[in-house]
Amino acid sequence: MKTPIELKILDSRIGTQFPLPAYATLGSAGMDLRAITDIALTIQPGETVLIPTGIAVHVADPSLAAIILPRSGLGHKHGIVLGNLVGLIDSDYQGPLMVSCWNRGSEPFTIEIGDRLAQLVFVPVVQAEFKLVDEFDSSDRGAGGFGHSGTK
């Protein structure tokens, strides 16, 4: 199922020098977001930088949101992860998509112009309405805290 999402190109290199975000395969859940900068950026160990993607999206449908997730290779091989761990794009947001990159590694890492930085994934949203109760019905899990259910 394909859902139309409005996309605004903020940098003229998108669609010419660099491709529009797209799914790489039929089974892909995310589309790659690229570093659309004027110069290569070197991120020092412990440093966080905000990197433009050259696009904005307007999801519009309140039953959907977009999330920005890390690319596994950058984190595993180079220690480059998202500074906010996950970026949440609400359906009514219309501003530029930026990627917060944090170098948690021990070596400087350079992001070149056009490098793939993160993935954009669209997810369903359910807006909850709280129902106040005095007690919960019992469950197998109960109110046990962190680590309560063990590892095995």
UniProtKB/Swiss-Prot annotation:
It holds the Pfam family dUTPase. This is Deoxyuridine 5'-triphosphate nucleotidohydrolase. Its EC number is 3.6.1.23. HAMAP family: dUTPase_bact. InterPro entries: dUTPase, dUTPase-like, dUTPase-like_sf, dUTPase_trimeric. Pathway: Pyrimidine metabolism; dUMP biosynthesis; dUMP from dCTP (dUTP route): step 2/2. Keywords: Hydrolase, Magnesium, Metal-binding, Nucleotide metabolism. One of its GO terms (molecular function) is magnesium ion binding. Belongs to the dUTPase family. Gene3D superfamilies: 2.70.40.10. This enzyme is involved in nucleotide metabolism: it produces dUMP, the immediate precursor of thymidine nucleotides and it decreases the intracellular concentration of dUTP so that uracil cannot be incorporated into DNA. Coiled coil: none annotated. It comes from Shewanella piezotolerans (strain WP3 / JCM 13877). Substrate binds at residues 71-73, 84, 88-90, 98. The gene is dut. It is an enzyme of class 3 (hydrolase). It catalyses: dUTP + H2O = dUMP + diphosphate + H(+). Its cofactor is Mg(2+). GO terms for biological process: dUMP biosynthetic process; dUTP catabolic process.
